[in-house]
Amino acid sequence: METAPKPGKDVPPKKDKLQTKRKKPRRYWEEETVPTTAGASPGPPRNKKNRELRPQRPKNAYILKKSRISKKPQVPKKPREWKNPESQRGLSGTQDPFPGPAPVPVEVVQKFCRIDKSRKLPHSKAKTRSRLEVAEAEEEETSIKAARSELLLAEEPGFLEGEDGEDTAKICQADIVEAVDIASAAKHFDLNLRQFGPYRLNYSRTGRHLAFGGRRGHVAALDWVTKKLMCEINVMEAVRDIRFLHSEALLAVAQNRWLHIYDNQGIELHCIRRCDRVTRLEFLPFHFLLATASETGFLTYLDVSVGKIVAALNARAGRLDVMSQNPYNAVIHLGHSNGTVSLWSPAMKEPLAKILCHRGGVRAVAVDSTGTYMATSGLDHQLKIFDLRGTYQPLSTRTLPHGAGHLAFSQRGLLVAGMGDVVNIWAGQGKASPPSLEQPYLTHRLSGPVHGLQFCPFEDVLGVGHTGGITSMLVPGAGEPNFDGLESNPYRSRKQRQEWEVKALLEKVPAELICLDPRALAEVDVISLEQGKKEQIERLGYDPQAKAPFQPKPKQKGRSSTASLVKRKRKVMDEEHRDKVRQSLQQQHHKEAKAKPTGARPSALDRFVR
């Protein structure tokens, strides 16, 4: 009789899990050591990484660096380096052609260096000397970092530069679009809108949104960077001008009869009937004022924060269709048919100044961002640039074949003029210098006559409205590369825009402070001060700030007689008079010393020189 085997007898023992020899894991940088069988094809070679281990450096091994302050060697941190630079490979197995940090030119480092190493520092205590060594080492490291990060800065604008003898005006937009990157090339586009043209356009203060209105009632607003349409309506009425208000959420449209306010969804919010037959619009962002010029000859200021008419000024010069603002002092410039340009402020009923610019009527006016130069064009086919720093004299003049109907300045001082269907752009030496009218910087021909011009803020883009629609041109060097994120941020969110609106309303500048020279607001008003002092004296009957008369103290033993008191009073008065005379003589000698020539001594024959 067969019996079942006892457990553990004639049965192969189970393998112990702990005693099982596991396969050693292979890392991706280790070589393949598995032997291949006969006839089997070897697999694809694995990416190897011949990175050698860095040997540990002893703690006492320092890099000796000579110091100019003391003979004690400095101990800066040693940068990490591979033993074999050829073995620096990435995960893909490729080798970095430029290992290590990028070299920095010595000239650039010296520009950021704040320590003059040519001067010898005085020897001092050991503690102070060590502090100076550490400060010098930190300063050197900081200057190197600043020089390396200078490549990321964009303060210097990049203009279009041709080769020797090449005229940049012959470079067309297609060549520029082909040469720039994809993101910049997308900023050049054409909107074919011949059905409702001609068009007027306006960019928001942040430069992110574009609004345009056609003469046949077409009004639209969009984010021109992403090409996302915000609103599009037809007001069924002629549109003469269009402007963004303090943000892209509100839009002012000058229609045939009255002024209308819309939001970014195309919903009409207000209809201002006191501003009738408006031809041109300008918005003053720091004062929240919307300036309107009408066919009736009135210049009207509307405070959009409270919805009140601040001032309605009669220019007494007929129809107003040429208007521009000075961004520096918020003064409105109006061009008239008699060839003059008048400067207006809501605080005055008369113009602040009048400038005779042309023999015929003025067709266009533009002021640069610094408020220094003004460009005008007239019916006499002349383009002039005036200096607004008190002289109001023309700096340069150029006669154009057809005359400019529209002018605009960029943030970097470029001047654009629209003449028929041609757009000419002139560039200067810099932001603070006037544009040179000798040779145009760029030239472009459009599909129809120009009806509106404006440079996009913080972008090298020029928007042109014409009878065929809207054209966005690329103009290298036109926009300001650096923007203030707290003032005009193109990338702000909705919450940031709301917070900025509250802050801007709290910091709103009153309309009464608009003047030609804003620096005069920080000066003392001497006339008002003297008038107030005179009124105070009349009200009190005496001058509270007058110096009290001298009263001699009484003395004993007969020395306080009447003659003695009069003598002492006269002595004090004479002393004060002598001080005044001495001070006037010193001032006179100082003036004579300044007027005295520093050259050779004058000759008696100089009076015969003419």
From Swiss-Prot:
GO biological process, one term: maturation of SSU-rRNA from tricistronic rRNA transcript (SSU-rRNA, 5.8S rRNA, LSU-rRNA)
Gene3D superfamilies assigned: YVTN repeat-like/Quinoprotein amine dehydrogenase
UniProt keyword Nucleus, yes or no: yes
Pfam short name (any one): WD40
An example molecular function term from Gene Ontology annotations: RNA binding
Chain intervals for the UniProt region annotation (Disordered): 1-103, 538-610
WD repeats by residue range: 193-234, 235-272, 274-312, 315-354, 357-396, 399-436
Location in the cell: Nucleus, Nucleolus
Modified residues (Phosphoserine): 41
Cellular compartments per GO CC: nucleolus; nucleoplasm; small-subunit processome
Biased composition (Basic and acidic residues): 7-19, 572-582
Keywords (A to Z) from UniProt: Nucleus, Phosphoprotein, Repeat, WD repeat
Function field: Scaffold component of the nucleolar structure. Required for localization of DDX21 and NCL to the granular compartment of the nucleolus. Part of the small subunit (SSU) processome, first precursor of the small eukaryotic ribosomal subunit. During the assembly of the SSU processome in the nucleolus, many ribosome biogenesis factors, an RNA chaperone and ribosomal proteins associate with the nascent pre-rRNA and work in concert to generate RNA folding, modifications, rearrangements and cleavage as well as targeted degradation of pre-ribosomal RNA by the RNA exosome.
Subunit structure, interactors included: Part of the small subunit (SSU) processome, composed of more than 70 proteins and the RNA chaperone small nucleolar RNA (snoRNA) U3. Interacts with DDX21, NCL, NOP2 and EBNA1BP2.
PANTHER family, per database record: WD REPEAT-CONTAINING PROTEIN 46 (PTHR14085:SF3), WD-REPEAT PROTEIN BING4 (PTHR14085)
Protein name: WD repeat-containing protein 46
Organism: Homo sapiens
